[in-house]
Amino acid sequence: MSPTIRHVGFIGLGRMGAAIARNIMKAGFTLTVYNRTTAKMQPLVDAGAAGAASPAEAAAGADVVVTSLMDDQSVLDAVDGGSGVLRELRPGAVHVGTTTISPRCARTLAALHAAHGSEYVAAPVVGRPDVAEAGQLISFVAGEAGAIARCQAVVSAYSRAAIPVGATPAVANSLKLAVNYMLSAVVDLIGQVFAFGEKSGIEPQHLDMVIQTMFNHPGLQEYAARMRERRFDDVGFDLLGGLKDVQLILDASTEACAPLPFASVVRDKALTAVAHGLGAKDVSVVYEMTRMNAGLR
């Protein structure tokens, strides 16, 4: 454990957040947790964490506060709302943001913390909830060097790799959006190949074998298996979250004046799947739209 960091506040206990929080506890840190749905706090409270009634209460006395939330607005509300983190966070404390947010939101958070006298470190994560549970996430970390050093032991508690990407927090979020775009594009392409294979007489297990051999990435292999089996109810990351992420990269690419032509294709297919009532299923359910477009049922 870090010689200076003892107390961690944690806000957001969804599938990812709860897994990250458990690993922080396992690393020996004192943990105070907050979640809007209070029932989600109970398993961690039963395991020894303190429960808080607001983000501000979770931040009170904390050396590091970690947020794992849904989107820009939920993070801004938790940080700067009426009962937000900044109401109680002490000067010099560090806010570690794991949420996939826009670069614009990251710049806003950095400015809010600078005005408050605290530090913001962007540390968005790559990996599904099962990877988070195993403490094997990849974190892209950006912020002031001293702040990164102070929160390093906390980030390491749930990450197999914490990759430093500079002093500007928004850069870490831009990198996360780029990685999400790449993965979502590849997942969609794999789905297209499965649909082509089904109509061309290729056995799904043979295609799956090729994919497992050629793409040595556990996340892509998992998505390929889900599509082959059409297994979308055991949700790791839901389609609504995936739609949010691809919209973020489209917005960021517009701001940067860097066209990403395939991103709009991925977004529209995800949006079509949501319109068909599939938003709460695993993000790989976009494969069902590919099958539909190919005339498969």
Predicted segment positions?
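Hydrophobic beta-strand scaffold residues
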Residues: L31, G51, Y120-V121, A162, ...
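NAD(P)+-binding Rossmann beta1-loop-alpha1 motif at the extreme N-terminus of oxidoreductases
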Residues: M1-S68, A93, T98, P129, ...
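Rossmann-fold dinucleotide-binding core
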Residues: T100-Y181
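Hydrophobic residues within alpha-helices
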Residues: I20-I24, K40, L109, V154, ...
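Helical "substrate-binding/catalytic lid" subdomain
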Residues: P169-A294
